[in-house]
A protein has these predicted regions:
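Bacterial N-terminal signal peptides
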Residues: 6-15
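N-terminal accessory beta-strand-rich subdomains and adjacent acidic, glycine-rich linkers
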Residues: 23-293
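An acidic-aromatic substrate-binding cleft motif
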Residues: 258-351, 359, 363
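Catalytic domains of carbohydrate-active enzymes, especially glycoside hydrolases
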Residues: 348-369, 436-440
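Aromatic- and carboxylate-enriched substrate-binding clefts and catalytic-loop regions
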Residues: 367-553
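Catalytic cores of secreted or luminal carbohydrate-active enzymes
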Residues: 555-602
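Carbohydrate-binding surface patches
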Residues: 605-647, 690-693
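C-terminal beta-strand-rich structural cap/linker in extracellular carbohydrate-active enzymes
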Residues: 671-698
Length: 698
């Protein structure tokens, strides 16, 4: 009798569990998400072709007041649906993007409080997105999130490419290791930055790239980050379970919310082909469509600028070294002794304008044009810039008129020194000044600790600020390239005037001691998953004035214009360095910044990437390959070309004796006729690459 009772009890428990379990599969059936209530606790699991990717993982929230949203739930409703549509981005890697998914919405009620929580899952052929939705039902109105408790229980001790979890910077080099090794390697992975706040010996940032022992590629990230803090991941390295770790505010709280509210999407990309990670549109598809009726003023940009002069030690942002401190409206620069190192001066900027006009560039970025740079960094100074007053040697009116006469624009620069309240105070006046003089793009910066003091770069307050700056810029038809801001999560679909972000370790670090060769072969798998990066490639002179060395070859730099997608591309080096190598510089002049079609031909994280892209509105193709710490040999098929048509290919390759450390400027250029049946044998040296332009023959 006792055995019969036990059997009946187990059958009852099984029935309860099966009644609360529901699942949804991808359109092609390879990915499956299962939702369940495990003893009233919401959980989900993900499989790929029957293999576990995410083991049963808990979902929910700890709240500051009113009781948590972690357990005590019943399933009170379920909806399923699907969508298959095609949309056209304002700019992008492809002319059109397919948005094809199956969807499941589960409606939960916490019986003890009668509070409702919905969870929506969208399953694509290459990944999963899910988010929390808080309906306006009367029992939960205003609430404060103490912690989000979303778990990602991994099915093994995977290889991962990671950077330390941090509330203030992503400007780290990537470490490749097993998940179980993160703890022991964390200390060495943390390098100094002007603003950084790490939080755990096993905390890492998204986008997190992983590879399983049997060849699955898994990427964890988020999409549509709005009115919510950015998510890091904290690893339980015994169980191999990641838990979401939100960026706190100055009080330690994570998010102040009110219903109705939708969280950002949590994303799990899964594929058995690394190339599909790079080609995925999962993050973009999970964002809302474009909010603007008129986007005619948003255009991709290829630009040059004085920036590398300051970064590499040739010049300064500041006009004078006379003043140890500056008071806006009181410091008299007309009485200051110029240092002679100020790069943003009339003669120098005219030189860059002339260079841009002669070589077909759209804009010239001028940093250091405005007063206040003498004490701008590291002082937690609130009133640091006014974004309106130029230095005495920068004639803003005359220089813009000169640029426009040559069909070139100047690009504005708004470094905030992270004094956010100050920037918001001047923002409209700064944008109005841009309209007055014909600027249509601004590079903003957030160097240093955030003011209001105690806030972090990736907290809810700052996430809202970055988006407000983009939306307000749109009122003035201005495009934004935000540096040191929160890492992108696909919002460029919704707000396409956000044409660039830094939000990672860019080329500037090549002048601060250098980055490892594999860095540019991992960024497209990680940082670029959320949106394009203003990486600022194109350095030809690898030995910087400050003694640092750029760990790349010239051909490796050329390849970045194809492998590192962005509608905003800079030729970052000095004009005179390009004029020394005019044949190699020709590729930078020719390469497009907007595309009809993009293909990833070869890829392995941190090892190599080969991409081919068709320039928008033309039949011209461009190919780029970057290599990591080891050489990479390609047997490159040109089968993507139109059949029956002949093309002229200009092939830029590392010379056999090229070496990123000792002989980085050794390259070869070959021209040959190619067709869709052509196969090319090409080699990129370690830290190098190759680039090809392919144009139809007339």
């Amino acid at each position: 009798m006792r055995k019969i009772f036990l059997l009946m009890f187990l059958l009852l428990i099984s029935a309860v569990h099966s009644a609360s379990a529901t699942e949804v599969a991808s359109p092609n059936g390879t990915l499956k998400v299962t939702f369940n209530l495990d003893n009233t606790v919401p959980t989900y699991a993900v499989t790929f072709r029957g293999k576990p990717v995410i083991k049963p993982s808990r979902l929910g929230f700890a709240l500051v007041k009113g009781g948590d949203l972690l357990d005590g739930f019943t399933l009170v409703g379920e909806e399923k649906g699907s969508a298959d549509e095609t949309w056209t981005p304002v700019w992008g890697e492809n002319r059109t993007i397919r948005n094809h998914y199956n969807e499941m919405l589960v409606r939960l009620e916490q019986k003890s409080t009668q509070r409702m929580l919905n969870i929506r899952f969208r399953v694509y052929d290459d990944g999963v997105g899910f988010r929390y939705e808080f309906p306006q039902e009367g029992k939960l109105n205003y609430f404060v999130v103490k912690d989000e408790r979303t778990e990602f229980a991994m099915a093994g001790d995977h290889t991962a490419w990671w950077i330390p979890g941090d509330y203030d910077t992503q400007e780290y080099e990537y470490t490749q290791s097993r998940l179980s090794q993160v703890r022991q390697l964390m200390k060495g992975a943390i390098t100094d930055n002007m603003s950084q706040t790490t939080f755990s010996p096993t905390g890492v940032q998204t986008s997190l790239m992983m590879k399983t022992a049997d060849g699955l590629y898994i990427n964890l990230h988020e999409a549509a980050l709005v009115d919510y803090p950015a998510m890091n991941l904290n690893l339980d390295d015994r169980e191999m379970v990641f838990t979401s770790w939100l960026t706190p505010d100055a009080t330690g709280a994570k998010a102040y919310l009110h219903t109705p509210f939708r969280s950002p999407w949590r994303t799990v990309m899964v594929t058995d082909d690394a190339r599909r990670v790079l080609a995925s549109n999962l993050i973009l598809n999970l964002n809302d469509p474009c909010k603007y009726a008129d986007t005619s003023w948003i255009r991709p940009v290829k630009y040059v600028g004085v920036w590398w002069e300051m970064i590499s030690g040739k010049g300064d942002w500041a006009y004078t070294q006379q003043y140890p401190s500056v008071i806006l409206g009181e410091t008299d620069y007309t009485k200051a002794k110029p240092s002679g190192r100020h790069s943003a001066n009339n003669a120098n900027v005219r030189k860059y304008i002339d260079f841009a006009a002669e070589h077909g560039f759209d804009q010239v970025l001028v940093e250091g044009w405005n007063i206040g740079w003498e004490d701008w960094a590291g002082n937690m100074k609130e009133k640091v810039f006014d974004f309106q007053t130029p230095y005495p040697d920068f004639d803003i009116k005359a220089l813009n008129e000169y640029a426009h006469s040559k069909n070139v624009r100047l690009m504005m620069h708004h470094e905030t020194s992270s004094s956010v309240m100050n920037y918001e105070r001047y923002m409209d006046r700064a944008y109005q000044l841009m309209n007055l003089y014909g600027y249509n793009a601004v590079k903003s910066g957030y160097v240093g600790d955030i003011i209001p003091r105690g806030e972090h770069h990736y907290g809810q307050v700052m996430v809202n600020h970055y988006l407000e700056a983009v939306k307000r810029a749109a009122d003035y038809k201005i495009m934004v390239n935000a540096h040191e801001a929160v890492r992108p999560t696909g919002l460029c679909r919704t707000y396409p005037n956000l044409i660039g972000n830094e939000s990672a370790r860019g080329t500037e670090y090549q002048a601060f001691g250098g980055s490892k060769p594999g860095h540019t072969a991992i960024l497209p798998f990680t940082r670029l998953q959320g949106g394009p990066m203003d990486y600022t490639p194109g350095i030809f002179e690898m030995d910087c004035a400050n003694g640092s060395h750029v760990n790349s070859t010239i051909c490796g730099q050329l390849a970045l214009y194809v492998t590192m997608y962005s509608p905003l591309q800079m030729a970052a080096d000095f004009p005179e360095n390009y004029l020394r190598y005019p044949d190699a510089f020709q590729f930078i002049k020719d390469v497009a910044v907007d595309w009809d079609r993009s293909l990833y031909l070869e890829a392995e994280p941190m090892a190599y990437i080969t991409a081919a892209r068709k320039a928008k509105g033309t039949d011209n193709w461009f190919v780029g390959c970057v290599s990591g710490n080891a050489p990479h040999k390609s047997q490159l098929s040109l089968s993507f070309l139109d059949k029956g048509r002949k093309y002229e290919a200009t092939i830029y390759t590392d010379a056999p004796d090229a070496d990123y450390r000792s002989n980085p400027k050794a390259y070869r250029i070959e021209r040959r006729t190619v067709t869709s049946s052509t196969k090319l044998s090409l080699t990129a040296v370690a830290g190098g690459g190759y680039a090809i332009s392919i144009v139809p023959k007339r």
